[in-house]
Amino acid sequence: MQSWPMPTIPSVPGKPAVLSLFDTSDQLIKPVEVDTPEVGVYVCGITPYDSTHLGHAATYLTFDLINRQLIDAGHRVHFVQNITDVDEPLFERALRDGVDWRELGSSQIDLFRSDMENLSVIPPRHYVGAMESIPEVIAMVETMLANGTAYIVESDSYRDIYASITATTQFGYESHYSRELMEQFFAERGGDPERVGKKDSLDALIWRAHRLGEPSWDAPFGAGRPGWHVECSAIATHHLGSHFAIQGGGSDLIFPHHEFSAAHAEATFGESRMAGHYVHTGMIGLDGTKMSKSLGNLVFVSRLTSEGYHPSDIRLGVFAGHYRDDRDWSTDLLTAAQERRQAWITAADNARDVQQVQQTIQKIRHLLANDLNTPAVLAEVDNWANLIPLNDSARTEAGRLMASGLDALLGVKI
């Protein structure tokens, strides 16, 4: 599937910093694995049945920052992202709206691409739909059936295939959730704990046998379509190998989605751990209330840009909080971001001290390298801007250097 255009990323002089991120599994901040020719990064994409909202944007802007820090340090990044373009939420929305689910998915994918391009997000090298990856999913399911880590439910007319939670001895190492919490989230987040014939209520669907009216693909074990978790597992390992540096997404994906997608890969390839880092972003609320489709309080990126808000202001609004924190979005936050960027523009237009700018850029690098400490980064640039005296001449080398640094490291244009 086609991605979106690559933004221009300026080259910035200075010494890059070693990126360290909080790992959900190990529960600590540690250096990212960069000892391979390419740093593999897999980020879970959208299910394309609605526009890109601020919750989506906050996640993808976080991983854009990670990409930018790795690129700044001279690493080649192999960035892969999926699209869950065949799934129940898409079918349900298409049925509600009286449109073909393929047409709905295609239109929302186009809008997502546009939003990411407007936000200057670095595109994935491989932007992959679930429907494109059926052969890889089938191969993974076949392997799991053959090695006994998956089984066919025989209790009714539908021969669905499930992966056992006992497929790996380390299941649960990513989330560290209790059995009770796993059962709660499994039921709330697309699981089917009541399915008759499963060996364990937490066993995850990896192949849904064909039902009348649903899309399906032929497979040696019967026609059907992939389960949610195995799609990401197959796509990630096909493009990045059985072990790679970072798997990421929102904190609502920790369980069951990321726990199971890692477990499926580990059961297939015999790895003890699919990713070196499991990185998760906090949830975004609106004016003190959790942002959700059911509440109808989503803030869409396309709506903000159509109303005239600059994409860099959206980025600054998101970066005002730390990526791992659950945080709030508001009109006041966006207004403050606009005012902040304008102050930076004014400072860049008046800056004359190149050494001062170089020192500030180095501080930005080190703050970002320490688990993407964006609130401290914004405060550091504010401090620099407040020191700049006003004059009436054109932007000079110092201002151009600061503009390049903010563009390269934050994706913010001034």
Swiss-Prot record:
The keyword Ligase applies. Gene3D superfamilies: Anticodon-binding domain of a subclass of class I aminoacyl-tRNA synthetases, HUPs. It holds the Pfam family tRNA-synt_1e. Zn(2+) binds at residues 44, 232, 257. Binds 1 zinc ion per subunit. GO terms for cellular component: cytosol. Keywords: ATP-binding, Ligase, Metal-binding, Nucleotide-binding, Zinc. It is an enzyme of class 6 (ligase). It catalyses: 1D-myo-inositol 2-amino-2-deoxy-alpha-D-glucopyranoside + L-cysteine + ATP = 1D-myo-inositol 2-(L-cysteinylamino)-2-deoxy-alpha-D-glucopyranoside + AMP + diphosphate + H(+). One of its GO terms (molecular function) is cysteine-glucosaminylinositol ligase activity. Belongs to the class-I aminoacyl-tRNA synthetase family. MshC subfamily. Catalyzes the ATP-dependent condensation of GlcN-Ins and L-cysteine to form L-Cys-GlcN-Ins. This is L-cysteine:1D-myo-inositol 2-amino-2-deoxy-alpha-D-glucopyranoside ligase. It comes from Corynebacterium diphtheriae (strain ATCC 700971 / NCTC 13129 / Biotype gravis). The gene is mshC.
